[in-house]
């Protein structure tokens, strides 16, 4: 934790950092650990579970439930969640997705936070690329049999059928929606979750 606190001291973070997480219980630990590092580095924090307490002030600025301006966040939320929101809006409208500065029901979306120009987000957008499992088949094709890689493909290939394989959603998290399949094509174990509609790697 000392190294993490040291990194925060040398960051461009503002004095107050909102720690954003969804309501998945597994994310509580990550949020609390980061909060401890931030406190050690001298920052004030507030953990936001979900988006329910966020809203806008009269000037259209994003605020938390205590009326504090939200302008610096560290998040456990996956960028993929924001992309899903963009896709959802894009399916209905042909214009660019607007970032809200108000809403009749005060409903704040994740994209209203993460894509606001004035909000400094710790976990930059480029982390989507190494964080997405779709890069694994590409790495395997570039570096086959590398000691730090497993045979991975976008389809079940002959080699995977021989050895058995795992089925994983490309942007899944927390061990959700994973199947373990034997070389006899029997499902040995599986987990449920909210990523069943995603494309898989094998």
Where are the regions that the model predicts?
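Domain-scale recognition of functional cores that engage charged ligands
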Residues: 1-202
